[in-house]
Every structure is written in C-alpha cells, then in structure tokens.
C-alpha cells in the first residue's frame, strides 16, 4: 500500500510551479496484479467516497495506474482499493493524491520500476484527464514529498527539496466544496 499526502500548490508567485506535501491528511492506495491487462477499482472508502467514480477511465488513481502500466509495457493489469483521507474538492490536492497513489502503487508491482519523475508525469496526465489541464504542482509533492519546484513543463523537469524543519503550516478549510474545474 502507498500513502499519498495532501498538498498545497499555487503558493505565492509559484502558480502551477510550487508545491508542498503535508503530513496529513493522506490517501492510501493498495494495488495488486490481475491477469487481465486492465485497471479496475474495487473499492473506494472514506470522506466523499460516494461522490468519486470507480470507473478507472475517469478516476485519477485509475488513469495514473494505467499510464504507469503503459509506460512500463507491463503485461498485467492492476486492481486498486482507495482509502480517501482527503475530502474531494477541499483545495488540498485530493485528486492529485489519488493520482500519485495510483501511479506509485502500480509502480510497486513492476519488475523494473519507473523513475520518480516518470511517476509524476503519469500522475499529471491523470490530473489533466480529470481537471482539464496538465499540471504537476499537486502530484509532484504527492509523489516526491517535501517542497517541489517545476523548472520546466517542456521538457518536464521537477526539483525536490526538504522544507526547513522550523516551517509550520496551518491549513483552514471552510465547510464548502469547490470543484477544481470551477476554481
């Protein structure tokens, strides 16, 4: 199983460039090999789970897992189970955490795992499919942890650094939801 953290993005002047992984909340994504060369989502539980599709072609974890399998040329499929700890539409990277979790969980099953940067790209493609734009400011820190800076999207280049241990973050979440496409 993979634990994939909530993230903050669009920090200061770093629109679609800066991202920061939080310690919590987080999603947990479990993956297992299946003989059919497809991705299935067996279960989603947790806050807002009833609003999240189990269709792997429309779910960010399913799309990211498929992207990993295709990039690696895997000869098997993946069944996913998702435990949401991050409420959807909360503004702290819920779909990005699921995408990162799907990519990383599928990667654990490969005989030759992909590089971290490739996982970020697979997760960003899932975000593109669900939100409408290719951006890695949430999935980057969800995959890599820490603070990330995207140096370039073409060609893709991302850098990770540890934030200062003295840095504290307070996240306030109002009790209403905003879909990323509408934000």
Residue ranges and their predicted role:
Residues 1-90, 108-112, 145:
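ATP-binding N-lobe of GHMP and related small-molecule kinases
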Residues 14-19, 24, 96-98, 116, ...:
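Basic, gly/Ser/Thr/Pro-rich low-complexity segments located predominantly at protein N termini
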Residues 28, 62-66, 100-107, 120, ...:
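Predominant activation on well-ordered alpha-helical scaffold segments within soluble catalytic domains
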Residues 38-43, 92, 160-161, 180-183:
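Short, charged, solvent-exposed linker or helix-capping segments at domain edges/interfaces
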Residues 90-94, 152-153:
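Short, conserved acidic/polar surface loops in the N-terminal third of protein domains
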Residues 92-116, 143-145:
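DPxDG-like acidic metal-binding loop motif
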Residues 115-183:
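ATP-dependent small-molecule kinase catalytic core of the GHMP/sugar-kinase superfamily
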């Amino acid at each position: 199983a993979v634990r994939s953290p909530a993230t903050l993005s669009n920090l200061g002047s770093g629109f679609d460039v800066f991202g920061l992984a939080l310690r919590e909340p987080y999603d947990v994504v479990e993956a297992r090999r299946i003989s059919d060369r497809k991705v299935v989502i067996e279960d989603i539980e947790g806050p807002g789970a009833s609003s999240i599709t189990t269709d792997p072609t429309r779910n960010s974890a399913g799309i990211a897992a498929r992207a990993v399998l295709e990039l690696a040329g895997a000869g098997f499929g993946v069944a996913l189970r998702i435990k949401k700890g991050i409420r959807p539409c909360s503004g702290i990277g819920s779909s990005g955490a699921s995408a990162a979790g799907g990519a990383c969980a599928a990667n654990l099953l490969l005989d030759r795992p992909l590089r971290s940067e490739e996982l970020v790209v697979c997760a960003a493609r899932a975000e593109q499919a669900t939100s409408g734009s290719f951006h890695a400011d949430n999935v980057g820190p969800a995959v890599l942890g820490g603070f990330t800076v995207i140096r370039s999207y073409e060609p893709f280049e991302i850098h990770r650094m540890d934030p200062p241990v003295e840095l504290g973050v307070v996240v306030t979440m109002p009790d209403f939801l905003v879909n990323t496409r509408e934000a």
